[in-house]
Amino acid sequence: MIPFLSLKDVTALHGEEINEAVTRVVNNGWYLQGKENERFEENYAKFTGTKYCIGCANGLDALIWIFRAYIEMGAMQPGDEVIVPANTYIATILAITENGLKPVLCEPKPNTLEIDDDLIEGLITPKTKAIAIVHLYGRIAYSEKIGEICKKYHLKLVEDCAQSHGCKSYDGRVTGSIGDAAGHSFYPAKNLGALGDGGAVTTNDPELASVVRALANYGSQKKYVFKYAGRNSRLDEIQAAVLDVKLKYLVGDNLHRKEVAHYYYEHIHHPLITLPDLLPDDQNAYHLFPILVGEGQRDALHAYLEQNGVGTVCHYPIAPHQQECYAKEEWNNPQLILPVTERLADEELSLPIGPSIKAEEVKEIVKLINQFK
């Protein structure tokens, strides 16, 4: 069996150092808000090229705290609008709606799978306060045009970097340093994954950093003094220690992903399958390798590969605007039709890719795909 991703194998790549890090924390006896957090936050800020990194419980919380902080700072208020890609994972939209903000869904480009920057300006209203870009699948979503739109309309640019650890923009900036603030997820399956949940906010804004740090600690900037109504959303010391180990190997692990991706690009040849545009290497961290399967054959290919011992996953089979939880929301008009987003939900299939996959496994996957009938 070739798994979609074996977390056991991924962890084993750096297992000795990870075990040493966990043991160090256990023996130290300090499990929250200690030196491990300080060290990781400092190192991850350096990696992303930002001044501030604030660890938190998970990637969803990271995004929630960014928007909540902007509300506390007076930059936004409930009812304001945030433009967001319609084909994102639902967490991006949850972070917006959890703060009483209104998501305005923007279609992606079918050849890149990222937000269509040609459509953004037409969605802006007097209530628009931010654009949230999502570097989906590890592919860069930022463009010079998006930056210009933000400047023209004085909009905040928020990055969802849950899938883009180590990805760079066309101008060389690492994701997480491009916008005004960025949310990161360290879910175990990510390019930089913990041994449980974890997240972080990166920014160059000192006020935002201070408010986010307080919100993630019950709303407190001083012990037993609560300026905001926050929540317990802290990154624990064990996860911080593990992440600091894995951060050292992120560039090398991403390089392996790129080698696998290039093999897919060069050797997958099937009339039903379309691959997204090949980006310059630095502009794709290859968190996932999405393919589009036409003529209603996505599920058949998924089942065929499963039967032949290959795990694949659909990202994502139900678009956010079609989810039951948002069925009655005012912003989610029943007549809302997003043909590109809905097509991607019907056709996308992610192939195995990761730092532990072997060359012979990749070759077997390609052979099976090309033989699919």
Tell what function each PLM region has.
Residues 1-30, 308, 352:
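N-terminal "arm"/small-domain region of PLP-dependent enzymes with the aminotransferase-like
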Residues 8, 37-42, 47-54, 60, ...:
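PLP-dependent aminotransferase class I/II
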Residues 30, 34-81, 95-99, 105-106:
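Phosphate-binding glycine-rich loop
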Residues 84, 105, 157-159, 203, ...:
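Hydrophobic residues in well-ordered beta-strands that form the structural core
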Residues 87-93:
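Conserved coil-to-alpha-helix start sites within the AMP-binding
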Residues 99, 152-153, 308:
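Helix C-cap/helix->beta junction micro-motif
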Residues 102-112, 313:
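Short beta-strand->loop structural element characteristic of the AMP-binding/adenylate-forming
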Residues 111-194, 201-202:
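Active-site phosphate-binding strand-loop segment of PLP-dependent enzymes
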